[in-house]
Structures are given as C-alpha cells and as structure tokens.
Amino acid sequence: MPSVECNTTAAKEHVSEAERMIQMVKERIRGLLATLPFSHVPKRMKIEFVYFVILWLNAFPVKSGISQTISPRELLMRWHLDYKIHCRVQPGTYCEVHNEPVPMNTMVWRAHEAIVLGPTGALQGSVKLYCINTG
C-alpha cells in the first residue's frame, strides 16, 4: 500500500477534496429525501439518513483510496456488508414492530408504527427504526 501523505491547511482555507465529499453526501441525502412520500421529515430522521449515506459510501472502494479492492469500512472493521443481510428494507418504509416489555395476557396493542431509517451496520443485519408515536 502507498504511504499516506498528510497535508495540513491554514485556518479559513478550504480543502477541495473535503468540500467535494461534503457536497456528494448532501446530494445523496437530498436524493434519498426526494424518494420519501412524506411532506415533513423530522430532524432525527435526517440525522439518521446522514449515517445511512455515510455507511454506504464507506462500503465501496474509492478510486483514490488506499486500496483499489478493499472498502474503507472493510479496512477498519475487517468484514464487509452483505447485500442479503443489510439491504432487506429500504429507508423510509413503513412497518409495524412487535413490542412486549413484560409478558401479559391482555388485549393491549403490542405493535408500534415505525419508519425504517436504514441498517445499523452490525453483522446480524439489524435495522434502525423511527417510532412514529414517540419519535
């Protein structure tokens, strides 16, 4: 692997590579928000969509990166994301999740309405959810 070159900048000076990356992340988030059928998106959902976009940007190798075949995420975590596990549900999908804090034999509603925020990035393929009732 090639050596890493560190180039520091002065205060108030822009780094074009970082600025381009920020612009690309914003474009991806805007694209994701445009696919949602909601007129209002809560702030917490927007924050989680940033995590979602960064997760997938780091899941693929970068042409100008350290390795041409290994993704930045795989370099750090030592394992890669699997399509069958981590792409089961699209972000913004409505779902009802089961909740049973204490076993009871009552007719209380045990499902919560939620919106999928994206995968957590864990090996098991867990998914982050936004509860509509509680936020």
Q: What does each model-identified segment do?
A:
Residues 1-135:
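Nucleic-acid-interacting cores, centered on viral/eukaryotic replication and modification enzymes
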